[in-house]
Amino acid sequence: MPKLEMMLLVLLILPLSYFSAAGGQVVQGDLRSDVLARYLQRGDRDARECQVNTPGSRWGKCCLNRMCGPMCCPESHCYCVYHRRRGHGCSC
């Protein structure tokens, strides 16, 4: 595969690692905080509503809804519960 085609392929696939369609989660790195802020400020999203998991680490996860353990709840009215033997989960 020629170099230009490979570069275009990488540029097309790269954004998929930052936005997950299942739950609206955003994965951020230290150098991409401005991209995250712009994403959150579009429409009705606000950076103040972003809850970042693993603060201080190189990679973190931003939840637009409530965070429950290592995951984001799918809707804003959900709350976090603990299930015996299954761990934390969202109850909606």
From Swiss-Prot:
It comes from the Eukaryota. GO terms for cellular component: extracellular region; host cell postsynaptic membrane. Disulfide bonds join C63-C72, C68-C80, C73-C90, C78-C92. Keywords: Acetylcholine receptor inhibiting toxin, Disulfide bond, Gamma-carboxyglutamic acid, Hydroxylation, Ion channel impairing toxin, Neurotoxin, Postsynaptic neurotoxin, Secreted, Signal, Toxin. Its main location: secreted. It is found in: Secreted. Residues 1-24 form the signal peptide. The modification 4-hydroxyproline is found at P55. Residues 25-45 form a propeptide. GO terms for molecular function: acetylcholine receptor inhibitor activity; ion channel regulator activity; toxin activity. The modification 4-carboxyglutamate is found at E49. The cysteine framework is XX (C-CC-C-CC-C-C-C-C). Hetero-, homo- or pseudo-homodimer (identical sequence, different post-translational modifications). Alpha-conotoxins act on postsynaptic membranes, they bind to the nicotinic acetylcholine receptors (nAChR) and thus inhibit them. Through its two C-terminal domains, this homodimeric protein would bind to two nAChR allosteric sites, located outside the nAChR C-loop of the principal binding face and at the adjacent binding interface in a clockwise direction. This toxin specifically blocks mammalian neuronal nAChR of the alpha-7/CHRNA7, alpha-3-beta-2/CHRNA3-CHRNB2 and alpha-4-beta-2/CHRNA4-CHRNB2 subtypes. Belongs to the conotoxin D superfamily. This is Alpha-conotoxin-like Rt20.1.
